[in-house]
Each structure stands twice: as structure tokens, then as C-alpha cells.
Amino acid sequence: MPAFLLKLSGEALGGEAGVGIEPEILKHYCDEIEAAHREGIKLAVVLGGGNLFRGAHLAAAGMDRVIGDRMGMLATVMNGLALNDFLRRRGIVSQLFSAVPMPGMVEGYNRDTAKAAMQNGEVVILTG
């Protein structure tokens, strides 16, 4: 079966306002992911974080760009935690990874571990 990388915009998770996480939108994405997963399609999902944090207004106020980027990375992790929880509640085995390890919360991304998870039929969620 083929493997696909799915990019979900953080703003899309926020619904019409593009802010926060709208449960119905998250459920819809889970429906689509579940349908593909049930067909045997291997999925890695990359999440944005624009629904929870946009750094442009802080950068305009003088915030260091790197700090803003780090805050955006944390926003993607929060979206990943939500998606991971919604998928698991449906019985879909998924594994959440972050470019920045957060021991006790999110495993640090490792290519081999993520690839093995996909080969084992898990949905891989990539954040950070």
C-alpha cells in the first residue's frame, strides 16, 4: 500500500475563525484519516499551528524571530496532542512525534522510529 504525507493547516482546525480547535473540524479530519487508514494507506500527518499562535504581530513589536518560531512549534505540538487523542479514542493506533523532544509528553522525532511505526500500521503525527 502507498504511503502519504498529509499537511493539515492549523488555521483550518480553527474553523471559520481560524482560531482555537473546533471539535467538529477535528472530527471531520479524523473521519478522513480513519477512512484512509482502514483502506490500508500509510499516513504521516504534519500539523500547522497558526490556529493557536501567529508570530507576525509579536515580530512587529520587536520579538526575536527565533522565539516566535519556537512558540509556533509549541502550537503544532498542542494540535498534535489533540489529533492523537481523537484518533486513539476511535481505536486508531497513532504515534505523535516532535522535532523538539518533550520527555513524558511527546517523543522526539526519529526517522527510523517513525518509519517503523508507519510500517506497523500506525498513523504518524509530526509536529514541532
Residue ranges of predicted features:
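Loop/turn-to-beta-strand initiation segments
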Residues: G40-A44, N120-V123
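N-terminal glycine-/serine-/threonine-rich phosphate-binding loop
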Residues: M1-K42
